[in-house]
Amino acid sequence: MNLYIIFPGALYPIEGMSQVRVRCQLERLSIDHKIVFSDMHSQKTNHNITSKELSQLNIIYNPIYLSGYKSGTIFRKLYFIVKLLKYHLFTITFEECRVKTRGVRKQIFSIVEQTNPDVFMIHYWYLGYIFKYLNPRILKLIDTHHLLEEKIALIDSYDLNIIQRRRQKLKLNYSLHRQREYFKLCNLIIVNSKAQETLIHNWNKNIPVIVAFNGQNLDSFLKYGNHSDSSAICFYGSLSNQFNRKALKRLLEQIFPIIKNIIPETKLYIIGISPPMDIINKFKDDSIIVTGYVTDIKPYLSRCKVMVLPLETGVGFRGRVVEAMALGIPVVGTSNALQSIELENGKQGFIEEDNNKIAEKVCLILNNNELFTEMSINCRKFAEANFSLESTFGNLSKTIKSLVAKVSN
């Protein structure tokens, strides 16, 4: 059967977990289905990497060009100013401003007409306005990545003044209305946690939902040896994210000093794109190693014995935790950090909210090789059983097949 899948950004270079999710999903779905894929570009970009990668999966690649593509710098700046004005003057989100244009719609319709898909699937909800124009026989799917309900619940934790917070609430509530409107038009909503499934069914039990964790091809991680330093820990994630920055600051300011007081030789690896040096430099010494973005994180992660993730707020699935666990690295973090992957407390790591308790559990693993070995084995087994491509997107593929079969009959 034919699937047309759209991602409202550039798939490559892969820098975040949303891109990882899309790439891995495409890899598994392409085994069972004929796929046409589009991502979106706002300026001249080399598509050779994306085209080459997807051709290896026998995926037809049709990039979509946003307004201003191939235009000069002045035009792009003017267009950007117009988008900013729409964003600030109205409740429409910046993401919608980018994709809700006649040019984008025209390109999508052209691809739909040429490929005649059985399934039309979008990542995020922004392109849901297209659904009402599609032939009713085409199944409509949304992979949410996150829900607006999650963001609304966190609004008071944002670093905003009263006016900014009020404006943000208006935009989020507008987006929530749009999100739910598009969900009602769908044949299937794909979420990455059971918590998201519950949030959707709390307002409408009739919305068809499937939970598909962030599956990955974990073979290279599972086979990679753990060469951990007996006293090394790590913080791993995209550090351009405000919630990860807060968690890192908490670790450096309140947790790592406790750990070092108990085990002075402990090293901390900070791994991830856009490390906030304004925060790190306040605490930097020889025990803190900052890698920044690395193309292959396995050699760095595998030096560590524990991953520490003291997130207080945040949304979405913790795909970086899965990579660490596949390398046999136990995780100590808050419930906010670990609930989406359904970590079993005491088996693959520990869930604690208090700084002293987090530090205590980290030191317990560092000082107890028998416990570390047991948890390390548990982590690899847990990652393989729950987050492989087959156990996640393989199940999604079966569900899509079943839906198409029902429509055909």
Where are the model-predicted features located?
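N-terminal subdomain of nucleotide-sugar transferases
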Residues: M1-Y65
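Conserved catalytic-core segment of nucleotide-activated headgroup transferases in glycan assembly
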Residues: R21, V211-D286, V290-T295, S302
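Membrane-proximal helix-turn-helix segments that form the acceptor-binding/catalytic region
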Residues: C24, G103-S110, L148, I163-I189
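Acceptor-binding helix/loop patch of EC 2.4 sugar-transfer enzymes
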Residues: Y69-R98, L141-H177, S238
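Acidic donor-binding loop of glycosyltransferase active sites
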Residues: N187, S287, S302-G316, L327-P330
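Short hydrophobic beta-strand element within catalytic cores of glycosyltransferases
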Residues: R320-A324, P330-T334
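Conserved acidic donor-binding segment of nucleotide-sugar-dependent glycosyltransferases
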Residues: G346-N356, L364-E370
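A short, well-ordered alpha-helix in the C-terminal region of glycosyltransferases
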Residues: L364, L371-N386, T392-K398
